[in-house]
Amino acid sequence: MARRLLGSVSGLALVLIFSVQLLAADRCQQVSAHNKRLGIEITDPRVISATVAVIEASGLKAPIVLCELHMPYINATVDHAGRLYLIGLTKTLIEHTTDAELRAIIGHEIAHIVLGHRNPMIELTHHRTAKSEQKADELAARWFGKEPMVSVLNKLRDDAARLQPARLREQAGAELEARVKALR
């Protein structure tokens, strides 16, 4: 069914997604021992279609597995297990984004891979520098337009208003606002 929905996507993008999904159907669960935030594999055709579009736009040739990210708020992340990249998306993010916004946020995560943002110290703390986030935003916006990227960043900022403690909420809001400002 997913193949029919994806229609005219390139063979390489299909191979990268479907071969990895077939060979590692439970890879998200295997890796969840390493990263407790990752859960079941995402097979939603809308997410797969957005990911294929990003892979084609980026020229990425690395295998990707899409995993549900266990967090109570809108978020996305990229992690790796060897040469395999795992993109984590929360259900809330998938449910509250348009197709264009979904491509923008997946594009942002794949931009981290393309730009080589793989500092081991950053990965240990699951934080990235503001500069690397802005560069990933800019690359995703170049692939799919500024408006979807700005829109999804605004949704992330609005959702960050639920974070506790207040210091974390204020910091996240300010960082996301700065990223929106940098794109305009």
Task: Name what the model sees in each region.
Residues 9-21:
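Bacterial N-terminal signal peptides
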Residues 28-59, 124-173:
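Short helix/loop segments within enzyme catalytic domains
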Residues 121:
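Catalytic toxin/effector domains delivered as secreted proteins or via bacterial secretion systems
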